């Protein structure tokens, strides 16, 4: 059985880890970095760049460079969070036929799952390069507060990338696994995982217990905000820079895509620098033109200023913390350790806010960028059976229910219920002789169904005619270990039933997923074709160079006709190398090799002659050694002398 890898698919950065010799290992990517920017760029020639190369060219290609795509995964175009992003992102967010938020790139509409799959493919390749074998199975992490549609979409992204997603695991839970196995001492303890990443915020209260030598991780509660993270912090700085520049120069940079991309890079840099210094300078020369002259952006920003810009965002994380503590049935003083996860937790003000709320310093010995991927790899080793001393009990983050008479949300499974779980309840009809019922499934905490997230609907037909309230329809909710919901309805009188795996009533259809899988495979084929073409080019170039060199040295030993034949073959190969037809390059390379055969024979004969002459000279030298060294060749003489002296010196 191959390795099950652990992937942290992040909004800003992604990371991949494996278990090796019982220990987790984070794998460096092809650029030598342990994390990969979650950035994808679509080039004019059809090439797709992922990670650092994509991020580097973002300034010159803003409309086709996609980042923070995780904020759109499993979301509808009309959701207010998506509408907010439309005004902020340089790329074009569009409405798909199924109502989802997709992205338009180079006249093609792409689903967030398809784009995220490119990052997952890069993570898969990173692991394969390290292991030297194909990887097909993975555990992928999601924010704990992701709803069913977002989890399903993440799983679909894995499929498109060619991965069998063995488990979807919550990010804070993964971080707790990494902490518990590495730093967690003996005995029972309660920990809070505060996870503020690039696009999402989660808080989970987790109990780590030692049960008969087995380490048990039980999630007591979870809460969060799937649209709050580092990207929002960056946006506050971007808005501030644009406003200040406008005040000083009277120019509005918010409509200039290239200027915006430069400001975004500067804002992110400034945010990171202000975690370790009190002041930084934002310096972007030639940012705009005014009256035919260039205008430069030069602005000092202090840590205090940054904190005032983002204070409201940081305080937005505290209410979910309060709710999570309450839902877990514990007091703040019961928490033994606070684990910080996500790059944003490096910000001193965030650490200070967490300390003020929990009344103790958060731990600093967990790597906020890598802990989640490490936890995913640990869970992978549990699923593959390599590790048996560990049990993970996670929860569903939001209540699940169906719409009943009057638009009421009747909750079937309450939030923070340990998963996997199953629950059944009997319902009846609202009208006389009602032949069918529509089961509408919702997720959320509001009392009325319309205020919650609609996950899907299906019909149960063929109910025998009877008075309202008579038929007995049993509705069953079943949540698997991935947190994905399966719903069934059964008419107890007839035994008729209907079941569905809830997919967002938008979501991707099986046909769409299959098509995207094929597209991804075609891309892989195209990558392979380009690689083979590059290799053929390199070999062709090397052949031209070596044949030319040999022709210069030994060409005078050839007949004129043979020499011309070789030169003509080289010229044809050079012409083929200007194009991109691998078959033509291979054919012309073979022709050069055939034409240069006589040249090779001449070179070989020449070398043989030189060696023979050298050997003959050596024999003569050896025979005369007893009489006089002067008779042999000078270099032979040197060799013999050296040997002779070595022995003498001993």
UniProtKB/Swiss-Prot annotation:
| Chain segments carrying region Disordered | 608-650
Q: Gene3D superfamilies in the record, alphabetically? A: 1.20.1270.10, 3.30.420.40, Actin, Chain A, domain 4 (3.90.640.10), Substrate Binding Domain Of DNAk, Chain A, domain 1 (2.60.34.10)
Task: Report the InterPro entries cross-referenced here.
Answer: ATPase_NBD (IPR043129), Chaperone_DnaK (IPR012725), Heat_shock_70_CS (IPR018181), HSP70_C_sf (IPR029048), HSP70_peptide-bd_sf (IPR029047), Hsp_70_fam (IPR013126)
Q: What does this protein do?
A: Acts as a chaperone.
Q: Spans of biased composition, class Gly residues?
A: 615-624
Position of the signal peptide: none
On induction, the UniProt comment says: By stress conditions e.g. heat shock.
Task: Give a Pfam family name.
Answer: HSP70
CDD domains with a match to the protein in the record: ASKHA_NBD_HSP70_DnaK-like
Name-wise, this protein is Chaperone protein DnaK
Superkingdom is: Bacteria
Please report which protein family the annotation says this sequence is part of: Belongs to the heat shock protein 70 family.
Q: Which cysteines are joined by disulfide bonds?
A: none
Keywords, ordered alphabetically: ATP-binding, Chaperone, Nucleotide-binding, Phosphoprotein, Stress response
Q: Where is the composition biased (Basic and acidic residues)?
A: 626-650
Which gene holds the coding sequence for this protein?
A: dnaK
One Gene Ontology molecular-function label: ATP binding
Species per Swiss-Prot/TrEMBL record: Janthinobacterium sp. (strain Marseille) (Minibacterium massiliensis)
Taxonomic lineage: Bacteria, Pseudomonadati, Pseudomonadota, Betaproteobacteria, Burkholderiales
